[in-house]
């Protein structure tokens, strides 16, 4: 039974190419079962990777240090390498579970890079998956009524009236008004589904952490009780975390409300939602490829698409996606913000219009849509030698030099001076977007690496443009979408 269970959980591709695999082992039943199942499976391979069990001591409970020692003893008995890493420093008073999760994965990635491991595995189970679904579903349902009210307003024509006014002096204004109303009704109703389904796909089996290390959760289809039965058959015991019974936590309350039958029913819904998310990611990717989009010098431009592309249910999602990426946002637009974007977008208006969304300026006219970073909250910062800084949610700067680097944005005078004294071939510079580009400066002058090909004042610096919503963790379900968008932001400057 044990060997059969192990073979059903893993794919050969999970461990290719992989010299070492990090297993997150807390000592609980799920993670211990993962460790022993991986060990059994790897024994069937000709050239198995090395297992390294890593325990993250969050230092939130006095028992945590001893629990890490117990895991180390278990690993020693089974000839498995074990490492304990600790979440140091002051802990936040609010959103503790969220912060602990971020810290835990960051520590695992750091240890993976230190050990030369390209894969991390965690012991998330079907129970975790179903609990996540229930919590997200409850939150989304609270917002559903408000969003439906907004969609209803669009259907009644209220939201379209502002745009109809812009067309009142044009021939065929009535026809255009009907077109605008129908387009926005169509988009609003369908785009709601895009975000709603994305959230309910829950925990992906495979993801990418920090765009470097694979994260696989092979136990997502297995119930916790099955894993505990497996451990009992082998005579293994595990550590029970008392917080797993603390009803002050939402997850515990949800867990205790779930019956076995409910578990099975929700699992089917999750599988459907995951499939829908993959399909939607592909639909969004196909739409992006069909559109004429350029990203250059801090400005994104979407050429006005054909009417059938404007009416595509994913079109506002695409505009919102590029707004977030240009604005340096860490999260894709919520249902509410996407609905607001739908209300503001109307490419049939003959007048130039401008508004802000997700830290980004969106300007549209008869030619198309332009997006660039809004000029606010772009703070200056110092990058000390041998340090890496994520700046404005858009750039990751690594300083390999001997002096600190000042980062920020250029004022208009600095920008004009740089353009005049450089070999830049910009015929019609768009200064608002150019003023959002990363600038390096010191007492000797300033340098905008994205604009100027040769270093003026700084060397031994690596600058990479990032996509913040997908930078820390990127789900396999979104692979089609990420693969299409990434080339637009594939900027890396090494000096």
Curated annotation (Swiss-Prot):
InterPro entries per UniProt: Rossmann-like_a/b/a_fold, TilS/TtcA_N, tRNA_Ile_lys_synt, tRNA_Ile_lys_synt_N
Claim: tRNA processing is one of the keywords in the record: yes
Does ATP-binding count among this protein's keywords? yes
* BP GO annotations: tRNA modification
Q: Which GO terms describe its molecular function?
A: ATP binding; tRNA(Ile)-lysidine synthase activity
E.C. no: 6.3.4.19
- What are the GO cellular component annotations? cytoplasm
- Please give the Pfam families that the UniProt record associates with this protein: ATP_bind_3
Which reaction equation describes what this protein catalyses?
Answer: cytidine(34) in tRNA(Ile2) + L-lysine + ATP = lysidine(34) in tRNA(Ile2) + AMP + diphosphate + H(+)
PANTHER family given in the database record = TRNA(ILE)-LYSIDINE SYNTHASE-RELATED
According to its record, what is known about the domains? The N-terminal region contains the highly conserved SGGXDS motif, predicted to be a P-loop motif involved in ATP binding.
Role summary: Ligates lysine onto the cytidine present at position 34 of the AUA codon-specific tRNA(Ile) that contains the anticodon CAU, in an ATP-dependent manner. Cytidine is converted to lysidine, thus changing the amino acid specificity of the tRNA from methionine to isoleucine.
Supply the name of the protein.
Answer: tRNA(Ile)-lysidine synthase
- Which species is listed as the source? Bartonella tribocorum (strain CIP 105476 / IBS 506)
According to the entry, what is the taxonomic lineage of the organism? Bacteria, Pseudomonadati, Pseudomonadota, Alphaproteobacteria, Hyphomicrobiales
């Amino acid at each position: 039974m044990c060997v059969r269970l192990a073979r059903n959980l893993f794919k050969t591709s999970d461990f290719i190419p992989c010299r070492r695999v990090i297993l997150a082992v807390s000592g609980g039943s799920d993670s211990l079962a993962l460790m022993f199942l991986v060990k059994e499976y790897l024994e069937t391979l000709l050239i198995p990777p090395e297992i390294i069990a890593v325990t993250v001591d969050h230092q939130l409970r006095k028992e945590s240090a001893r629990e890490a020692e117990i895991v180390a003893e278990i690993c020693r008995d089974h000839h498995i390498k074990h490492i304990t890493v600790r979440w140091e420093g002051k802990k936040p008073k609010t959103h503790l579970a969220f912060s602990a999760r971020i810290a835990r994965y960051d520590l695992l990635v750091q240890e993976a890079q230190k050990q030369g491991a390209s894969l991390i595995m965690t012991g998330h189970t079907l129970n975790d998956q179903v609990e996540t679904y229930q919590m997200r579903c409850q939150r989304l349902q609270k917002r559903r009524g408000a969003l439906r009210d907004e969609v209803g307003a669009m259907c009644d024509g209220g939201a379209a009236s502002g745009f109809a006014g812009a067309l009142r002096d044009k021939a065929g204004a009535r026809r255009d008004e009907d077109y605008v109303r129908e387009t926005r009704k169509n988009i609003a109703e369908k785009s709601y589904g895009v975000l709603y389904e994305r959230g309910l796909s829950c925990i992906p089996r495979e993801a990418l952490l920090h765009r470097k290390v694979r994260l696989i959760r092979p136990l997502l289809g297995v119930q916790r009780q099955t894993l505990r039965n497996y451990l009992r058959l082998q005579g293994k015991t595990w550590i029970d975390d008392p917080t797993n019974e603390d009803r002050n936590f939402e997850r515990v309350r949800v867990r205790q409300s779930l019956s076995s039958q409910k578990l099975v029913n929700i699992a089917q819904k999750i599988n459907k939602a995951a499939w829908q998310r993959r399909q939607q990611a592909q639909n969004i990717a196909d739409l992006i490829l069909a559109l004429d989009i350029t990203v250059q010098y801090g400005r994104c431009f979407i050429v006005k698409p054909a009417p059938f592309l404007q009416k595509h249910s994913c079109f506002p999602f695409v505009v919102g996606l590029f707004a977030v990426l240009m604005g340096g946002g860490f999260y894709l637009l919520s249902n509410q913000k996407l609905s607001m974007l739908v209300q503001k977008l109307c490419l049939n208006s003959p007048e130039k219009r401008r508004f802000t969304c997700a830290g980004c300026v969106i300007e549209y006219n008869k030619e198309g849509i332009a997006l660039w970073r809004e000029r606010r909250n772009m703070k200056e910062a110092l990058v000390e030698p041998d340090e890496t800084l994520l700046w404005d949610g858009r750039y990751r700067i690594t300083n390999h030099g001997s002096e600190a680097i000042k980062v920020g944005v250029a004022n208009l005078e600095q920008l004009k001076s740089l353009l005049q004294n450089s070999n830049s071939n910009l015929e019609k510079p768009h200064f608002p977007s150019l003023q959002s580009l990363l600038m390096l400066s010191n007492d000797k002058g300033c340098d905008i690496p994205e604009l100027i090909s040769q270093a003026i004042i700084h060397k031994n610096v690596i600058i990479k443009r990032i996509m913040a919503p997908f930078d820390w963790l990127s789900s396999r379900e979104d692979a089609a979408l990420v693969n299409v968008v990434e080339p637009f932001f594939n900027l890396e400057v090494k000096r």
